[in-house]
Amino acid sequence: VLTFGFTLLTSDIAIGRRTQKSAIGAYAEMKPKWKFLGILTFLVPVLIMTYYAVIGGWITKYAVVYLTGQAKAAAADDYFTSFITSSTSPVIFALIFMGVTAFIVYNGVQDGIEKVSKWMMPVLLVLVVIISIYSLTLKHTDSSGQVHTGIQGFLYYLTPNLEGLTVQRFLQILLDAMSQLFFSLSVSMGIMITYGSYVKPDVDLNKAVNQIEIFDTGVAFLAGAMIIPAA
């Protein structure tokens, strides 16, 4: 995040601000022969959307379930399995999710994405904080009778385990971290180039990128604190 992430994110936003265009147009303006790079970066979010639509459909389904007062039914062990194995329900909710997403994107960055994000992101952040705190209060007893608490899970989450670390495993961890970096910061996907085209010339890019990285890392940490202690 502090090295590759900062450099790549700054580059993407700077390209967008300089050219005032989306990925395909930006690369073409810098050099016509580079237009294919813009096309490749455009294809990345298209591919990502293929499974985002599925996961978004799951979230939409559970949102409807909870809003209609069926939370207890959704907590059953076989509820999720029966939903995803249905021949119609996952498709319907994925289409609903895609329809809402398409409507927001159709309205553009400022009138669509920005307006929705201004209220959606704070709500999601508050929910993540609440669930993270709740995860710390959980505890369960395993088959041997030993009690495991959320605090123990949180400490496990924070404690590095260097046992059995080899060069090969270290390189794999590094590769995984790089993959997470590209995905989390949305670099080299054309997304930040498009956002960069809306950045005003007087904005300090170094400061803006630092803020993005701090917020991104903070949310990632909270996501881990939300999931791992509960596991």
Question: What is each stretch, according to the model?
Answer:
Residues 11, 56, 109, 190-191:
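Hydrophobic/aromatic residues in alpha-helical transmembrane segments
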Residues 5, 16-18, 48-54, 181-188:
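Short helix-coil transition sites and intra-membrane helix breaks within transmembrane domains
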Residues 118-231:
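Membrane-embedded translocation segments of transport machinery
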Residues 21-40, 53-112, 139-175:
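Inter-helical loop and helix-membrane interface segments of multi-pass membrane transporters/permeases
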Residues 1-11, 37, 89-90:
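Extracellular loop-to-transmembrane helix junctions
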Residues 11-21, 202:
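Membrane-interface helix-loop junction between the first two transmembrane segments
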Residues 2-6, 40-61, 123-136, 215-226:
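Hydrophobic alpha-helical membrane-insertion segments
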